[in-house]
Curated annotation (Swiss-Prot):
Organism whose genome encodes this protein: Lactococcus lactis subsp. cremoris (strain MG1363)
GO molecular-function terms, A-Z: small ribosomal subunit rRNA binding; structural constituent of ribosome
Gene this protein is translated from: rpsT
Gene3D superfamilies documented for this protein: Ribosomal protein S20
Disulfide-bonded cysteines: none
The organism's place on the tree of life at top rank: Bacteria
UniProt protein name: Small ribosomal subunit protein bS20
UniProt keyword annotations, A-Z: Ribonucleoprotein, Ribosomal protein, RNA-binding, rRNA-binding
Keyword Magnesium listed: no
SUPFAM superfamilies, per the entry: Ribosomal protein S20
Amino acid sequence: MANIKSAIKRAELNKIANERNAQQKSAMRTLIKKFEAAPSEELYRAASSTIDKAASKGLIHANKASRDKARLAAKLG
């Protein structure tokens, strides 16, 4: 465990950020699974939006975002 006050604070902030990132990635995966179960234009837009947001925040690589969106689009039509 950290002894320095700033290190303790950084550790706590890292924990909070880690939880937030995990929650956002989980939400993205959930929307992708919902779309794959029942493809529709509305679910495609929602999944695509969450993928773009994850990529812009650095949660996933830009190439992965592009690949995921292409796979969803292929399943849509």
